[in-house]
Amino acid sequence: TTLNQAGNGVPVVDIATPNGAGVSHNLYQDFNVAPPGVILNNATGQLTQTQLGGLIQNNPHLTGAPANVIINEVVGANPSQLQGYLEVAGQQAGVVVANPNGLTCDGCGFINTPNVTLSTGKPVLDAHGQLQMLDVKQGALTVGGKGLDGSRQASVDLIARAVQLNGALHGKEVNVIAGANRVNRQTGEIRAQQGDGAVPEVAIDTAAMGGMYAGKITLVGNGAGVGVRNAGQIGASAGEVVIGSDGRIENSGRISSATQL
């Protein structure tokens, strides 16, 4: 994994060579996205057009096929601030940003990726090199006032010990899984486990200015106390809203669904 920049100064990450399963696993001391954005370079062609940085050079680490999943894992001690767009250059690939110290998305969005996972869990690969599990023991994921734009993606997954929505989250299919869990990314199984540190008061908290706007919304809140608290708007325009919670569900806002709750 090496860092370059486009002609206009936007950072370009030349992602690590993918393994046999097509997974590029990148480790960072810090991972932040400033408002101009960051490009994840999955390009094998000589010159590739990007929305954020114009024409960029191909990634020298990609001697064979491009990646189909790009994992960005933070191994340092600082939380991540995502304040701009993350663009995959070249062939589309799923994007995972994992930071156990926490993540704040405040004006973040994603380009040229079919599915995005933001998590405070540790990515675990199986024997074949595919992403098997996210191991969540700590960390909060916050959506700030400038929101999260997942409208270009088939799905957006937020997987953390606690999730706080202070802004709007837009997507086609949104899945929020909160609590200390081992979340199997291949089977969908969610297995509760002992977390680190204090238990958050609320697993999934949507403030008055926050909200989720998507075709289909699934919320899973595990842990003691309040599982899901909504003071904002949770609306599924095309499909259903599914809420599963170990704790209480408190709703002082609005939850609406085209088909069913």
Regions found by a protein language model. Name each.
Residues 249-251:
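Extracellular beta-solenoid/beta-roll
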Residues 1-237, 244-245:
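Solvent-exposed adhesion/ligand-recognition segments of exported proteins
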